[in-house]
Swiss-Prot record:
Function: Catalyzes the removal of a penultimate prolyl residue from the N-termini of peptides.
Organism listed in the record: Coccidioides posadasii (strain C735)
Secretion signal span: none
Catalytic activity: Release of any N-terminal amino acid, including proline, that is linked to proline, even from a dipeptide or tripeptide
Protein name: Probable Xaa-Pro aminopeptidase P
Cofactor: how and how many bound: Binds 2 manganese ions per subunit.
Residues involved in Mn(2+) 2 binding: D448, D459, E571
Gene Ontology MF terms in the entry: metal ion binding; metalloaminopeptidase activity
């Protein structure tokens, strides 16, 4: 079997990296399609690991890496790409599996420590990322490579930058990194591997997009001219969907489709399975975008690189490639000599919503807030007044049904987190149908949910208690609420990053020796991925490099979690905007936030003695706004209207 070493100057064997055949796949865009759940017992991975090690031995690989991402570096993936989950049994969205001939380790972050501990069997070591004296997965891999061992990875599943950094780390212990074009986990999976999805691609109308795809391509070409580059190769699925004003359903909850794109100064191409395109899509693209087979991307890159080499202008021989694009794409274009790795200008443009997208975001959050209000009123009535026994999935199914009644609803934006009591402490918990607890009205109930509407994407978390909360539960909730308010009311000079304001949300917890192991905020797409970059609020390096800009849409979601006891999280979506200030130091614009989430907070969990007068006013003003913007949905629904009226009374 052909291997290629970690030098990025080597060419990729195109024939070896063609994607697997595309087969018909059922639509996966709703809560009824739960592939994995946090409540599952560990899977026995012994046979899977044994088969993988046999393949490693055949290919002279001593250590094999299984990242979470697909060949487009997607955070959320199609079932056919859930390789790390298959080999390890751990189903969280983030992590990396490392398998040597005698050991196996799984590294993940604080969101998933509890889940991973439950799902990994005795074959696996859990590496808790960021914890003291715990090696990173790169360091652990390098340790296993000591003495000249070979580390292998599918080059389509990591970026070129990751490959370079990892190669250097491994070399320090005497090992080496190679790319293994045929994915070994796919070979272990065999015929049981889910088929590749072939869902239809649809046009995203200008009434929701706010800008034509022709205008977006023109803007991108201006960037190419500015940087003196021949073109840009695009592999991130949400960037392709946004650029061409198209949407799909190939990945659960994310309205994207498998494709690549190339834009030069004179051409625009879309590499996609043409059978997925409706006639409306073909008419939409017209003669402005050339259609190519999805599988032909690597051969096209080789030809493109050769054509650029004949250009006399040395600067125009290089192509822009996102720093998130795969190592295999980088090599196919010619490596460092032909590629400039950049933060994608498309990602930056997409993150700054236009006026139409912002109006859509506001409108869909009002409708979504009404849906959540109806749901919480129903849930309290069932649990308290009717004494109905409901489990976590029963409840989330009802929420999905309520949401589906609203205008322009398409589906959910992620699998609803419906968690009672100690399950609320599992940050990314998933209730298992047929094997989840009943909701305890005398315990905390945390609901993190969202939806896809044609005019926007929503993501809201509310923590409620229908009985008598403990003093610690009330204290924790109120400290988290203070953090949410601190972000909501923050004002800062243009150029400030989300890294810089993350402590605003944590300060109240920190004063009490408390904290949470996740970011405070992420970007949100416009009828696109619920997690969107490049900006965010947290301690990631990327967040320190990306200023928050007017037009960004972000979550504001501090939390607190006690393992085995309870969890608290409150989440609103906010829009960054320029604000007026009494003064203007440095003659800079100043940035603040506008909240768009319209769902009542839980007064039963508030310890108002911990709130300042300003914070109480914020809560009262917020609840007045929620009441005014959503009460009209309940003119014929006395139960919900009365619940909304009660929950929005002044504190």
């Amino acid at each position: 079997m052909t291997l290629f070493r970690s030098s990025l100057r080597l060419r990729l064997p195109v024939t070896l990296l063609s994607p697997p055949p595309i087969h018909k796949h059922s639509r996966l865009f709703s809560a009824s399609h739960r592939l994995f759940t946090a409540a599952e017992m560990p899977v026995d991975t012994s046979q899977r690991l044994a088969k993988l090690r046999e393949l490693m031995k055949e290919r002279h690989v001593d250590v094999y890496l299984i990242p979470s991402e697909d060949s487009h570096q997607s955070e959320y993936i199609a079932p056919c790409d859930a390789r790390r989950a298959f080999i390890s049994g751990f189903t969280g969205s983030a992590g990396c599996a490392i398998v040597s001939m005698s050991k196996a380790a799984l590294s993940t972050d604080g969101r998933y420590f509890n889940q991973a501990a439950k799902q990994l069997d005795e074959n696996w070591l859990l590496l808790k990322r960021g914890m003291e004296n715990v090696p990173t997965w790169q360091e652990w891999t390098a340790e296993q490579a000591e003495g000249g061992k070979v580390v292998g990875v599918d080059p389509s599943l990591i970026t070129a930058a990751e490959a370079r950094k990892l190669s250097d780390t491994i070399k320090n212990t005497g090992g080496s990194l190679v790319g293994v074009p045929d994915n070994l986990v796919d070979l272990v999976w065999g015929g049981d591997r889910p088929a590749r999805p072939r869902e239809k691609v649809m046009v995203h109308p200008i009434e929701f997009a706010g800008q034509s795809f022709e205008e977006k391509i023109t803007d991108l070409r201006k960037e190419l001219t500015k940087k003196k580059r021949a073109g840009m190769v695009i592999s991130m699925l949400d960037e392709i969907a946004w650029l061409y004003n198209l949407r799909g359903a190939d990945i659960p909850f994310n309205p994207v489709f498998f494709a690549y794109a190339i834009v030069t100064h004179s051409t625009a191409e879309l590499f996609v399975d043409e059978a997925k395109l409706t006639q409306a899509v073909k008419e939409h693209l017209g003669d402005k975008v050339a259609l190519r087979p999805y599988e032909s991307i690597f051969e096209s890159l080789k030809l493109l690189s050769q054509a650029a080499a004949s250009n006399g202008d040395e600067g125009h021989q290089k192509f822009l490639l996102s720093d998130k694009a795969s190592w295999s794409l980088n090599l196919a274009l010619g490596g460092e000599e032909k590629v400039e790795e950049v933060r994608s200008p498309i990602a930056d443009a997409k993150a700054v919503k236009n006026a139409v997208e912002l109006e859509g975001t506001r409108a869909c959050h009002i409708r979504d807030g009404a849906a959540l209000t109806e749901y919480f009123a129903w849930l309290e009535n069932e649990l308290i007044n009717k004494k109905t026994v409901l489990n976590e999935v029963d409840a989330s199914d009802k929420l999905a049904q309520i949401r589906s009644k609203h205008k322009d609803f398409v589906g959910l934006s992620f699998d609803t987190i419906s968690s009672t009591g100690p399950n609320a402490a599992i940050i990314h918990y998933r209730a298992e149908r047929g094997n989840c607890p009943n909701i305890d009205p005398n315990a905390v109930y945390l609901c993190d949910s969202g939806a896809q509407y044609l005019d926007g994407t929503t993501d809201t978390t509310r923590t409620l208690h229908f009985g008598k909360p403990t003093e610690m539960e009330k204290k924790a909730y109120t400290l988290v609420l203070k953090g949410l308010i601190s972000i909501d009311t923050a004002v800062f000079p243009k150029g400030t990053t989300g890294y810089a304001i993350d402590a605003f949300a944590r300060q109240h917890l920190w004063r009490n020796g408390l904290d949470y192991l996740h970011g405070t905020g992420h970007g949100v797409g416009s009828y696109l991925n619920v997690h969107e970059g490049p900006m965010g609020i947290g301690t990631r390096v990327q967040y320190a490099e990306t200023p928050i800009t007017a037009g960004n849409v972000l979550s504001d979601e501090p939390g607190y979690y006690e393992d085995g006891n309870f969890g608290i999280r409150i989440e609103n979506i906010v829009v960054a905007k320029e604000v007026k200030t009494p003064h203007k130091f440095g003659d800079k614009p100043w940035i603040g936030f506008e909240h768009v989430t319209m769902t009542p907070l839980c007064q039963n969990l508030m310890d108002t003695s911990l709130l300042t007068a300003e914070e109480k006013k914020w809560v009262n003003d917020y609840h007045t706004e929620v009441w005014e913007k959503t009460k009209g949905f309940f003119n014929n629904d006395e139960l919900t209207r009365n619940w909304l009226k009660r929950e929005t009374q002044p504190i």
